[in-house]
Regions:
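Alpha-helical scaffold segments that flank or form the walls of functional sites
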Residues: 99-173, 192-210, 233-241
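Short, ordered loop/turn segments at secondary-structure junctions
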Residues: 123-124, 220, 250-252, 280, ...
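Short acidic, glycine/serine/threonine-rich loops at helix termini
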Residues: 128-135, 181-187, 229, 258-262, ...
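Glycine-rich tight-turn/loop motif centered on a GG-T
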Residues: 138-150, 186-194, 224-225, 247-248, ...
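Active-site neighborhoods of metal-dependent hydrolases
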Residues: 158-161, 167-194, 198-221, 269, ...
């Protein structure tokens, strides 16, 4: 097939101009030619190293060269004009298990943020290896629609993903809740028997052998709440042989947050697995300020054991309405309700007043349903986000009709609000927390960095204007200042054109060190 004529593209200042192509020019004769060159960019390489000016060349799915590439030509050239080229962002904590199976356009909420890889199977919830014939219990029902619980093995889920690729790369965990329901049915309000725990361990081991990266728990939620520490250790023993990760939505993120951290590290150490604490927070007003204690405890463990945590840049969480009894001092907005879908986006307090009932009764009538809970302190969010052990994860729920804005805004919010506006950390650190650090923790080779030979997962953004536009009132808003996103060398999003239909994503596998 003949090569296309070179296209040279540039950027004009401010308004939402995005990527603007000039008239195609004939390709000069060059010794080396590639598919794409991003010229005159500010390179933030994902390692935390200082930014530098230069060009990036892409050939196929890899970065072919970085530096002064004036002697090279490409089928497409983009004039960055000093705007930032960085590794594509890695969402350390997503619930995109279903979304990655629905076609490339389903991932606009992530590609429009510059996200090129998502980690699925979090909080103990994964679409495999347990099919379900009826609606799963909360919070599983808010993650994936009932008709998608059809995969009886991780291999089946992986094959579906390979057959119908997403716009983004996917790294997958196996969820404890899913395993528990597979082994125990709906009788999960008790500890598993030894036989049931062994069945879960074997299923986890099989999934890890088929390419899953680790094991996640959601010990806060009813399907797993009754599981004692010993049960989790027994199941997680499969991680030892396969060198998988232990990732957890801890048993408690409020009054018992310190005890939950201790339990988490006990589990990880017992099976020799690196530990990732999901969406670390100190929830509920009486715990505001306790992040100083929780971070100090994590630091003590991290001095001798691999432990990290992810965080999202908001003071509100989002989960099932049944997760905690509602409180007058914690405002709640409904994200979805099965019996009352018309209430999505409404305040629980207003619904209760309209119905003439208290908050608890309103939540009961809305269930199954979900909500946004304004239960954190800004000072804690900043302290956790700025901590060197943190990385960024959205925890976004793509199915809710009125989702938490983190689904659409997490990564631009870190760049625009917390880095540029508040100066919580510099741009290099912000990018590192969303790229190189995350790739290293999850064991994803050749991603998360700008380096010759690395995969061409890239984002081009304007550091002066990038910001989140998604709000609690209008959560489905595309970010500003993310100009283009590439996955494995293919463009999957442009600010001017939106999401492409390019199925550029791949299923990724963890490459773990021999020892913890």
């Amino acid at each position: 097939m003949p090569r296309m004529a070179m296209r040279r593209e540039g950027f004009r200042p401010p308004p939402p101009g995005g990527i603007l192509a000039s008239e195609p020019k004939g390709a000069p004769t060059m010794a080396f030619r590639c598919d794409l060159i991003l010229r005159d960019a500010t390179l933030v390489d994902g390692t935390g190293a200082p930014r530098r000016r230069g060009d990036v060349a892409v050939r196929g799915d890899r970065i072919a060269a970085i530096g002064d590439l004036s002697g090279m030509a490409a089928d497409r050239e983009v004039m960055a004009g000093g705007r930032v080229v960085a590794p594509g962002f890695i969402d350390a904590h997503s619930h995109d298990d279903q979304a990655v199976l629905c076609g490339p356009a389903c991932m606009l909420c992530k590609t429009s943020q510059g996200v090129t890889t998502v980690v699925v199977g979090n909080c103990g919830i994964s679409l495999s290896p347990v099919p379900m014939a009826e609606r799963p219990p909360a919070p599983m029902d808010g993650i994936c629609a009932p008709e998608w619980w059809i995969f009886d093995s991780f291999a089946a889920y992986a094959e579906r993903l390979r057959a119908s690729p997403s716009a983004v790369n996917t790294l997958a965990l196996i969820g404890h809740m899913s395993l528990r329901i597979g082994a125990m049915g709906r009788d999960t309000g008790r500890p598993a028997t030894d036989k049931e725990a062994e069945r879960m361990r074997k299923q986890l081991a099989q999934a890890l052998s088929e390419g899953a990266a680790g094991f996640s728990t959601g010990l806060f939620y009813p399907p797993s709440k009754a599981a004692p520490t010993e049960e989790v250790i027994a199941v997680a023993e499969a991680l030892r042989e396969h060198r998988g990760l232990y990732v957890t939505h801890m048993r408690d993120e409020a009054d018992q947050v310190l005890d939950s951290i201790e339990e988490t590290l006990r589990i990880g150490r017992a099976v020799g697995a690196p530990v990732i604490i999901s969406h670390h927070k100190c929830a509920q007003p009486e715990n505001h300020g306790r992040s100083a204690e929780s971070l100090a405890l994590i630091e003590r463990h991290a001095a001798g054991y691999p432990v990290a945590f992810d965080v999202y840049p908001y003071t509100a969480s989002s989960t099932s309405l049944a997760a905690r009894p509602p409180r007058a001092d914690v405002p709640v907005t409904v994200t979805y309700s099965v019996p009352h879908p018309e209430m999505a986006g409404r305040a629980l307090e207003g619904i209760a007043a309209e119905w003439g009932v208290d908050l608890a009764e309103a939540a009961r009538r809305l269930a199954p349903g979900g909500g946004v809970f304004h239960n954190m302190a800004e000072a804690d969010v900043r302290r956790i986000l700025a901590h060197p052990l943190s990385m960024v994860g959205s925890d976004g729920g793509p199915l809710a009709p009125h989702p938490h804005p983190r689904l659409w805004g997490t990564f631009p919010r870190v760049l625009g609000h917390y880095s540029r506006e508040l100066g919580l950390f510099d741009l290099e650190t912000a990018v590192h927390k969303m790229t190189g650090r995350t790739a290293a923790i999850f064991g994803i080779p050749d991603r998360g960095v700008l380096r010759e030979g690395a995969f061409a997962d890239l984002v081009l953004f304007d550091a002066a204007t990038v910001r989140d536009r998604a709000s609690f009132a209008e959560p489905r808003q595309v970010a500003e200042g993310i100009l283009e996103t590439w996955v494995n060398g293919q463009s999957v999003y442009t600010q001017s054109g939106g999401a492409s239909e390019t199925p550029a994503g791949r299923l990724l596998h963890r490459e773990a060190p021999e020892t913890v």
